[in-house]
Amino acid sequence: MADEIVPPATQLAAVSLENDGSTVQRAQFSNRVLIRTILDRPDGGAGLAGQTVRIGGWVKSGRDQGKRTFSFLAVNDGSCPANLQVMVDPSLYDVSNLVATGTCVTVDGVLKVPPKGKGTQQQIELNVVKVIDVGTVDASKYPLPKTKLTLETLRDVLHLRSRTNSISAVARIRNALAFATHSFFQEHSFLYIHTPIITTSDCEGAGEMFQATTLINYTERLEQDLIDNPPPTEADVEAARLIVIERGNVVAELKAAKASKEAITAAVAELKIAKETFAHIDERSRLRPGLPKKDGNIDYSKDFFGRQAFLTVSGQLQVETYACALSNVYTFGPTFRAENSHTSRHLAEFWMVEPEIAFADLEDDMNCAEAYVKYMCNWLLEKCYADMELMAKNFDSGCIDRLKLVASTPFGRITYTKAIELLEEAVAKGKEFDNNVEWGIDLASEHERYLTEVLFQKPLIVYNYPKGIKAFYMRLNDDEKTVAAMDVLVPKVGELIGGSQREERYDVIKKRIEEMGLPIEPYEWYLDLRRYGTVKHCGFGLGFERMILFATGLDNIRDVIPFPRYPGKADL
């Protein structure tokens, strides 16, 4: 094609490899080599000895050996958890400006196999021949010293914490799980649908939603306007009203006198202007500081969207509209809950993966959820093992074994009623829970973890929950006491996935909305899916941060999302 863009030859060369793998691979969009491409080789990079490369990264630690010998830098560029040992001859550069933790360096050097017995565990190191660029650090002020900081402390330096080994590993694990999510659903012919962040629907019916409004801006502008241009007085309104009457009388008199058409037309035009002026003056005279009100309530017709709007708590309802046309779909994006909760399991902003499957029932839903979770576990074991080893070493020694267990073990499946019976039996034998156990409760985290970690010792799917603790859109079972809902429970975190077969029967779902005290009007569009060509379908939601907690073994959800939002905190 005449307009085809041909990549430059240097760019093509940068991504080529010799058949024997002896040529180092350069980054495609940067004139450097990713440290991962050196250290992740089966030989640890030893086969690249003699190659000249350019690397860039941040100094994790440095040793200034004095003017007569090499200084050593441990450099990391974020592409992998391992650091590359870099040797700098003091004759090339003032190494005192290089050794501080956090210093950014770009250097050219020759890869060399370190002498045996040198003390390094790496198979390769870089002997610098030229220092290209340096981003210096004042070690006395740098917030991330060599000493290990707690994850809680790192939350106070969100803009820098990704430079630490732990948070950078979490970032790579998070990236891998996101990649795995898209890969799984794309491989199974699901379409990725972008659902809205701003919505007028409350999927959960909980009411704990962030409101999206411009009324505060409107109010601030109004208050300033009333200061700059004081509203008309009652006398101003009365004067404008009298002018309207006067202009009206003139028109009436001209018509009675059978005046010329031109005179009447001119008088009517003046009357129209008088009426418009009166309406404007009368409207401004009614303006008051504060939010606009109508019948004692906030008048949302003055808001940006002409009605109340919120940040979404779930993309499920919206993505269902596409499932009812395109069959298999999923959405993956941020959701928001205005819960004033400070626990280690709650965020105000978090990510959800929500697939919907048409022509499918609850069993299909459970099968898909199990396959998806296993796929993600295998993905981490195959593509992110070094990062998982770091998490196992520093935080949870059992995290890799847990991934292997979930990836290789068939999930158990029991009804909610059976789960309650098992918990009641445990209580009868002396097991103590903080939360009571009885039919009709929403299982607490301690119940879920006891089922998975103690009784079954593997992932568990609990299904057919009481309708009173589940959402209106879940399909009512024939017993009319339970709904076709399911939760996937895993060790470490408890509930990982919540899903259901959706209620496709118009009369039943309308009654459920009414029973839960929700207004019908906001859900009329959702009911249309049942009015016109209704279809059996199901879906589920996976809390993405919970999946990362499960994988990494970390205890606080604030440490597995780049920029955590929770009550009192919305930094950056």
Curated annotation (Swiss-Prot):
CDD domains: AsxRS_core, EcAsnRS_like_N. It comes from Arabidopsis thaliana (Mouse-ear cress). It is an enzyme of class 6 (ligase). InterPro entries: Aa-tRNA-synt_II, aa-tRNA-synth_II, aa-tRNA-synth_II/BPL/LPL, Asn-tRNA-ligase, Asp/Asn-tRNA-synth_IIb, NA-bd_OB-fold, NA-bd_OB_tRNA, WHEP-TRS_dom. The gene is SYNC1. One of its GO terms (biological process) is embryo development ending in seed dormancy. Belongs to the class-II aminoacyl-tRNA synthetase family. This is Asparagine--tRNA ligase, cytoplasmic 1. Its EC number is 6.1.1.22. Residues 53-131 bind DNA.
